[in-house]
Amino acid sequence: MRNPTWEDAEEIGLALFEKFPGQDPLQVRFTDLRRWVTELDGFSGDPAASTEGTLEAIQMAWWEEWKS
């Protein structure tokens, strides 16, 4: 299995849900979200390559896990 990058929103969303199960993803600032993603074990994306769109996709994937 390869290490996740910014394009792997579903995988990252699940990892964030597992790491922060009580955190409402919609209450997380993008600056914190970006840092938390880059600190995930195995994350191999370029920290400078994140965009608002990729962070939104990750946040929504995390929210889908959190709300269910």
Model-derived regions: residue spans:
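A charge-rich, low-complexity, intrinsically flexible signal that marks solvent-exposed coils, linkers
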Residues: M1-S68
